Amino acid sequence: MKNLFLTLLIITSVSFLNAQNKPQRKVQLALLIDASNSMDGLIEQAKSRLWAIVNEASSLTVNGVAPILEIAVYDFGNSGISDKNYVRLQTNFTSDLDVVSEKLFALRTNGGEEYCGAVIEKSLQELVWSRDPNDLLLIYIAGNEPFNQGPVNYKSICTIAKSRGVFINTIYCGEYQQGVKESWKDGATCSNGAYFNINSDAKIASTPTPYDDQIIQLNKSLNTTYLWFGEQGVMKKNNQIIEDKNAFNLGSGIASERALVKSKSAYNNASWDVVDAFQADSTKILELKDDQLPEELQGKGPEEKAEIINAQKEERAKIQAEIQDLSKQRAVFLSKVNRNPANAGVKDDFGTAVNKSMKEKAVLKGFN
């Protein structure tokens, strides 16, 4: 009996260690946004739905562990872009979600030629895609001109994407059948991706709830737990506030969605925030000189710094838990609103298209 117990203990320990040693899964989203003259509505939808998309991605798990989320942004079809095919990288894959928001809010439209094959080709060439077959790799391209325009054959690019395990998902801004005629459906199915059509001029309704004011106030308290460090720290801290305001200006509901993101592990700012960086590598932070640190940590010894940082960490965790609790109540409220017959038949928009297909493809990769 004793030997059996020891054997079971060893098997359990090995299984635990194997689970611990498995690398954290990744979800990589490349957003390719048509920025030609008629696409102002599309850009507004992308800005409005960013935090809903991030919340959906961060809810995916494998063995109870959330994935690392990385998002890249391109705009194309804008005549102000110097590239011969009117394609521009706004940000490579990044986990800095404030940067993603910043880039989306900076997008502007201008007349130009929309070459879908060219922007997909660029995204496959320039972005650092994961080579792990277990990771979820997704391209979302949205626009309203024929998919086969331009010098790059989308079919050949689609073959490359499929061979790398990248799903190309297409979002046509217009009538469903028109998108089919203009090859947007074929542009998706050729890589086993999903095809959607949306009304890009439809405004995203930010449904207010009784919980939004509390969540927004907690978000302000959450911001006080962030302590900058390094050359870009102050700028990054200021940008956090700017992106809060950008979300709030779109509606209290969207501000609440952003606050929920900030309560999760997906919102990690180890590149500029002392608390996140300390958790990743405490030695690095404790070795920084005073001119690289905020006033709260200047002139302090290692033990005192660690004490202050840990106190901030505990306060942050407490606020995040409160935001998550209120967000659950908010979700219940919204589910009741959405069950109302008056809200039946709501059509897809940029965000729902992304979230539907992301969930579908995630299941194929073993995510829950």
Outline where the language-model segments fall.
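Bacterial Sec-dependent N-terminal signal peptides
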Residues: 1-24
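Alpha-helical protein-protein interaction elements
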Residues: 8, 68, 85, 218-221, ...
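Divalent cation-coordinating acidic motifs and surrounding scaffolds
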Residues: 21-202, 209-212, 283-286, 290, ...
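A post-motif C-terminal structural segment
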Residues: 185-285
